[in-house]
Amino acid sequence: MRNPGGPGWASKRPLQKKQNTACLCAQQPARHFVPAPFNSSRQGKNTAQPTEPSLSSVIAPTLFCAFLYLACVTAELPEVSRRMATSGVRSKEGRREHAFVPEPFTGTNLAPSLWLHRFEVIDDLNHWDHATKLRFLKESLKGDALDVYNGLSSQAQGDFSFVKQALLRAFGAPGEAFSEPEEILFANSMGKGYYLKGKVGHVPVRFLVDSGAQVSVVHPALWEEVTDGDLDTLRPFNNVVKVANGAEMKILGVWDTEISLGKTKLKAEFLVANASAEEAIIGTDVLQDHNAVLDFEHRTCTLKGKKFRLLPVGSSLEDEFDLELIEEEEGSSAPEGSH
């Protein structure tokens, strides 16, 4: 993974099984105990051989390898337990667990707005509590940035938003600390969308095509799987997205990527947010960028002269097979009633 913003920015420690030294057992020459009367021997020698040395030659290496294996497993368990207890990162079966550590910030080694954005992304991915977040914040500040922090009152140091504004005032562009974000309403169709089958990178995805959503969103788990948690793939999102009930959506950042629908590839801009159970939602922004034509009557989506089948949300499992017929012949005319 690239280290965004400089060396050591986001240290990821995947929990991987180590090769135990017990594998030495496999390298031991195979020794089979055969009763002495059946052993071949040179002519004129007594063929009767004691069985004890043969048994010990087999048992001793086996016991030694077993001892080494148990010792390695015993030594590994505390380390695994410690990582799992301290990482606090999101995990899914079959995926590696990542622990992200912020890069030190001196005030000049990185744009303050970018460093603060990445720090908040790491906070969300690691699921830090308030005390842990403040502890990592203080430990990450160095040089002039630490001087700014130490110049605050103890009450201000306990308020992340206050520390954030102080750092932006000290090292950011004029007026950066007081910029007013644009507010965007995320009013999706509430279960009335359609699925479109494709890929993001190498990962198969079932996109929810939602003409009622103004922005396109992917779940953080999908972003992490495709990018291996590369924070350099995220850029700050400076606006505010609110859902129908008025709550503010937590946005990790903007992800510029490419989606594949059959052989058709499309550039897409997604907000990375845990907004719903859907792994990816294609909103009107992406649809308009590529002049998509949705025909809900015939359940098709036309993009770049090609039609793709849509599956309504809530359809039976048997209808899932329709998604395999993702792409029709190029040049087929669009059905009447397309809009």
UniProtKB/Swiss-Prot annotation:
Record's note on what induces expression: By 12-O-tetradecanoylphorbol-13-acetate (TPA). No TPA-induced expression is seen in mice lacking Fos.
Residue ranges of the propeptide: 1-188, 325-339
GO molecular function: aspartic-type endopeptidase activity
Post-translational modification: Undergoes autocleavage which is necessary for activation of the protein.
UniProt record, GO biological process: protein processing; skin development
Record bears the keyword Transmembrane: yes
Keyword set includes Protease: yes
Signal peptide start-end: none
Annotated effect of mutating residue 210 to A: Abolishes production of active form of enzyme
Consequences of knocking out this gene: Mice display fine wrinkles on the lateral trunk which start to form 5 weeks after birth. There are no apparent epidermal differentiation defects.
Role played: Protease responsible for filaggrin processing, essential for the maintenance of a proper epidermis organization.
Name of this protein: Retroviral-like aspartic protease 1
Gene symbol of the encoding locus: Asprv1
